[in-house]
Amino acid sequence: TENFEITLKIKDNPFKVDYLNYKKKEKNEVILNFKGSKNRNNELVIETFNLNEDENYIKIKDLVFNEKFQISRFDEVNLDYIDDDKQKNSIRLKRNKKKYFLTGSSFNADNLIEDLLSDDDKDTKIIDINSNLKIDVKKIFLDSEYYLSNFKGDILIKNKEIYKADLIGSFSKNKKLKLTINKDNNNKITTLFVDEAKPIVKRYKFIKGFDEGSLDFFSSKKSKKSVSQIKIYDFKLKELPILTKILTLASLQGIADILSGEGIRFTEF
């Protein structure tokens, strides 16, 4: 077994974690400390990882990478920081035997949603964990204007893929977002209903002045063939050039493929 411990202090250089939308303030100092070992199974075990910047911190316990440098398990992740959008993030992801529990008061998912919808080349297979994930977060920010309250549900992950999910959250005025995923043999059914479509649709720059409306999405995927349907109701639209209408559908289809872990592509509507 090879043991190590490293401490880094960063003050004059920039430092950021894009996935979490975390960025060090210009004149602040970030202290990174991590210790771990490499075991006989060729696994890299990070026993503790700590990032501290004033009142911001990221803490990880017993993070294990397999020989392919994929995350095979971890015991606990604690995040408490103000991100680059000035939003408060305070969540904990903790393992209890084979189940994981995500809890907390708030998390800004804006940057995460943007990455998922726009990047079809990103390798999402870095995590190799088969587990049940139970979620209970009081507030999820979708952007600077919209957020979900009491975001709860369960996700079942097998072979780096979501097999089952049932998630629900509330917008203000008692409007809802509901996502379900069910895989049976080779058929995967995905449904997404959003009472406030704007935080999703506005991310497509060729749609101008979209407001109000709800989004209803259904996808059935069997083997490599998927059939999807997207409906948007009761919305206002200032401008949508005719030549981009098909592009709109093609881009929104990316939601289905992201949820299926396949990258952005579409077969038919």
Labelled PLM ranges:
Residues 1-269:
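Membrane-proximal interfacial segments on either side of biological membranes
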